[in-house]
Every structure is written in structure tokens, then in C-alpha cells.
Amino acid sequence: ITQGVNPFLATFVAFLAGCAAGLITGLLYTKGKIPTLLAGILVMTSCNSIMLMVMGRANLGLLGADKLKSTWISVSAVLLVLVLIFYFLNTNLGQAFIATGDNVEMAQSFGINTGRMEVLGLVVSNGVIALSGALISQNDGYADVSKGIGVIVIGLASIIIGEVFFGNVSLFERLFAIVIGSIFYQFLILAVIKLGFNTNYLKLFSAIVLAICLMIPTFKDKIFKGVKLNAE
């Protein structure tokens, strides 16, 4: 973008770069037999060095450059990703993908190549992550190699919040619930800032929110069981 490349093309290249990172991680895990977490750490560390090489420094401003900075573009990107993922998951390949995520042994018993499914999952997820990072950097007006730190907590919190508030729903509604969960999470962070809390404690607050969200289903089951026993 800073070199005058079309921002749409630059964003698409970022998506492809994320897919490549996911592919390498998947191959290290499935072919190299390196544990998933360790494979992810290895690729993430390598990507950090590659980003420094491409950017030339840790922080790069995008002010004055032609970039994608529009709410409608971000909303359109989210809706496009939702529709594409929903369509994919309803195909035969998508169903095999879901089966692998639910139960690897069962999927293998049906003749599904679970290794390929795992690589595919990493490719798609890392591509979407890179796309999100590209759009956020353009919206904020700068790119930083450390910008992705803590994003895993935000992602988990978004999924858990969506699962808690939207339990037994259809596939598309479940995908949309994750988006609602991410928006709700950002509102919680904004509320903490507005209340005057020290911003240095945001990651601590994020971890607490995630822990509470993870415990809500357990407490909900216990409460429902207690109510049912009292009713009997």
C-alpha cells in the first residue's frame, strides 16, 4: 500500500500470505508430526521476522496512502466471509471438515482424509485472520508487528459469548452469533475504558471475561438441574 499498490490487491495478497502460513503450519503438523501448538509457534515466530523484513521496521504508518477505510467495506467483508463459510460447510467437503472437527476417529472410519481436512482448516482460518489484520491496519492507519498479540483471547471470547447467548441455533445463526459475540466483547472493553480503568489492565480484564464466559454453561447446567430437582 505504501508503494502505491491497489489496496484491494494488497489486501488479497495479505489473505494469500495468511493461507500460506496456515499451509506451512498444517504440513508441519500432519507431515512433520510436530505438535500443533509448537508448529504454530514456529510459524508465528518466522512470520514475525518476515513482517519485519517486508515492513523494514516494527511500526509503519499508512497515513496519506490509498487504503480501504470504510465501515461498509468491513461489514461487506464480514458478510462475504460468513456466506462463503456457510456455503462451504454445506458442501460434501464441508461436512467432512465438520466431521473431522467433531471426532477425528469417527471421520477416519468413514474414509475421510483427516490430515487434509486439518490442513484445510488451518489454511482457511489463517487466511481469514490475515484478511482481518489487513483491514484493521488500514482502518487504524498503521501496521505493527505486535498488533496480533492477545487476539486469540478476543477470538475465544467472541466464540464463547456467542455460544452462551445463542445456544441451539442453525449453522448460519451460529456463525453470525460469533460476529455478535465479538461486537459484544468490544462493547465490554469500551465500557471498561469509559469507566476510567487503567488501559494497562485490559488484557487482564479480557482473561477474566473469557474465564467467566467459559464457566457460564457449567453454572447454567447446575442451576437448571437444581430447578428441575426442586420441581420434582
Task: Give residue ranges: language-model regions.
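Transmembrane alpha-helical segments in multi-pass inner-membrane proteins
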Residues: 14, 129, 133, 139-204
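Helix-loop-helix "hairpin" substructures at the membrane interface of multi-pass membrane proteins
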Residues: 6-8, 21, 70-152, 157
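Hydrophobic core segments of alpha-helical transmembrane domains in multi-pass membrane transport
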Residues: 48-49, 76-87, 125-133, 156-163, ...
